[in-house]
UniProtKB/Swiss-Prot annotation:
This is Succinyl-diaminopimelate desuccinylase. It is an enzyme of class 3 (hydrolase). The gene is dapE. It comes from the Bacteria. Binds 2 Zn(2+) or Co(2+) ions per subunit. One of its GO terms (biological process) is lysine biosynthetic process via diaminopimelate. Keywords: Amino-acid biosynthesis, Cobalt, Diaminopimelate biosynthesis, Hydrolase, Lysine biosynthesis, Metal-binding, Zinc.
Length: 376
């Protein structure tokens, strides 16, 4: 029963498609989709492979995924070769097994089985696949969505196969994502000899009260779908050409804010810059807006997927819109009916990444039931 989804997962894992390289993963998928009668549009942009595939007419159900993976890291720490799919103790090991080649295999096999049983199904099934999700994303779904909008393509429902499950398959789904805003802050002082602190302004000492308040900022209390907005300082360093007997003239601070739908970019920037001004800090700051938060408007889609998950796992999933960003934020420009669900994320981006083989079959069956409920 596992053979098809397991074999396809293994084929994809055996390709070292480190982002943004695809190296043939998508052609494996495309050939199988063509046999099912899908129209294929390759949308390759610079070093990134993308494709849009569809079959049928009417309301469109889109499966969204990525064939790229993060690097393996230190191969010496792996128990198996990261790009040789290996079965051991009921698990499938390999880079991308959980994030997200296993999910892509489950999607495709579910669609194959569905079309074989219901060749005259109503509606349209589509796939949107990229090889640039794990790194910049600049030539991936972001640009493809713009192209599809120009062509007046319509997506009614979108299922993203990101690894949303936590401890066990089916325990978590996502119907939204937090926004992300980063800051590169330069705090200025005056450089001088460390033995004469009264003559100079030490930007490190001067910034400590501000940094303490910054790290404790409360933007909101969160809501039913989102945790409170959070801020994390990621890097602090003084100017490079400063020896141990010098007061530095500059201090550079990097921080990131993950925010929900209760606040926006302008409000966050205003709060942070008001805090800087409160402490009379001389500064310059450069903001990078990575992603806007979103929340799916479709309780229908959430309830439908919940029933499918329960049918095959006996678990009612929790809604947890935490974690990083995903390509779902770009699809939100085409549809606000989005749900994310996939394999457990316990080992993603780690050495010895793996999935349980039984989970691959269960996920395939959940995706199949999802299609049944939407298109029959």
């Amino acid at each position: 029963m596992h053979t098809n989804v397991l074999n396809l997962s293994k084929k994809l894992i055996n390709i070292s498609s480190i982002s943004p390289r695809d190296l043939g993963c998508q052609e494996i998928l495309i050939k199988r989709l063509q046999l099912l009668g899908f129209f294929i549009e390759r949308i390759n942009l610079k070093d990134t492979k993308n494709f849009w595939a569809y079959r049928g007419k009417g309301k469109t159900v889109t499966f969204l995924g990525h064939t790229d993976v993060v690097p393996a890291g230190s191969t010496r720490k792996w128990k198996t070769s990261p790009f040789v799919a290996t079965i051991k103790d009921g698990k499938l090991f390999g880079r991308g097994s959980a994030d997200m080649k296993g999910s892509i295999a489950a999607m495709l096999i579910a669609v194959e089985n569905f079309i074989k049983k219901f060749p005259n199904h109503k509606g349209r099934i589509s796939f949107l696949i990229t090889s640039d999700e794990e790194t910049s994303g600049k030539n991936g779904i972001r640009k493809v969505v713009s192209i599809l909008k120009e062509k007046k393509e319509v997506i009614d429902f979108c299922l993203v196969g990101e690894p949303t499950s936590e401890k066990i398959l089916g325990d978590c789904v996502k119907n939204g994502r937090r926004g992300s805003l980063s800051a590169d802050l330069m705090i200025y002082g005056t450089q001088g000899h460390i033995a004469y602190p009264k003559l100079f302004l030490n930007p490190i000492h001067n910034s400590i009260p501000f940094l303490l308040d910054l790290s404790n900022l409360i933007f909101d209390k969160g809501n039913l779908f989102f945790e409170p907005t959070s801020i994390q300082i990621s890097k602090i360093f003084s100017e490079k050409n400063c020896t141990l007997n010098m007061i530095p003239g500059e201090l550079r601070v990097f921080f990131n804010i993950r925010f929900n739908t209760l606040v926006n970019k302008k409000k966050i920037i205003r709060i942070v810059e008001n805090l800087l001004n409160k402490y009379l800090i001389k500064y310059s700051i450069f903001w990078t807006y990575h992603a806007k938060p979103f929340l799916s408007s479709s309780n229908f889609l959430l309830n439908l997927l919940t029933k499918c998950i329960y049918k095959h796992t006996n678990i009612i999933p929790k809604i947890k819109n935490n974690g990083g960003t995903s390509d779902a934020r770009f699809i939100f420009n085409l549809t606000d009916k989005i749900i994310e669900f996939g394999l457990p994320n316990l080992t993603i981006h780690k050495v010895n990444e793996y999935v349980y083989i039984n989970d691959l079959l269960k996920l395939q069956n959940i995706y199949y039931s999802f299609l049944e409920k939407l298109l029959l």
